[in-house]
A protein has these predicted regions:
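Structured beta-strand/loop patches that form or line metal/cofactor-binding pockets in enzymes
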Residues: 1-55
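Metal- or metallocofactor-binding catalytic centers and their adjacent structured scaffolds
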Residues: 37-114
């Protein structure tokens, strides 16, 4: 089963009440949704919530890096999760938020066919 299509969607979720840290107030969760579709139309979903002050990633950086990762993963075996990780790690250091969204989506595909 090969990866046929990958889509990324920015999703901003307003919080009912902003939370405040020493770094300032946060009024919304700025997430990225990843949808991976295999060549048999099995779909896996993943999501990440990057937070600049914790991991150095933002919704915008995740979208940019995610597009590069998506291009590289097209045609890859959707069930070879370790191989997908190795490919992403060879492409770019760190960026674990967006990589985790891809990981979750690949695991979701595996769960869908189990």
């Amino acid at each position: 089963m090969k990866i046929a299509r990958i889509e990324l969607f920015p999703l901003s979720i307003p919080l009912k009440t902003p939370f405040i840290t020493s770094l300032g107030a946060v009024a919304a969760a700025e997430n990225v949704i990843v949808r991976i579709t295999a060549d048999d139309d099995t779909v896996g979903w993943g999501e990440c919530n990057p937070f600049w002050s914790i991991n150095g990633e933002t919704q915008e950086t995740c979208m940019v890096v995610g597009k590069h990762l998506a291009r590289a993963l097209i045609g890859h075996d959707a069930l070879d999760i370790a191989g997908g990780h190795a490919l992403m790690d060879r492409m770019i250091f760190g960026n674990n938020s967006i990589k985790s969204a891809f990981d979750i989506a690949l695991h979701d595909i595996g769960a869908e066919i189990a």
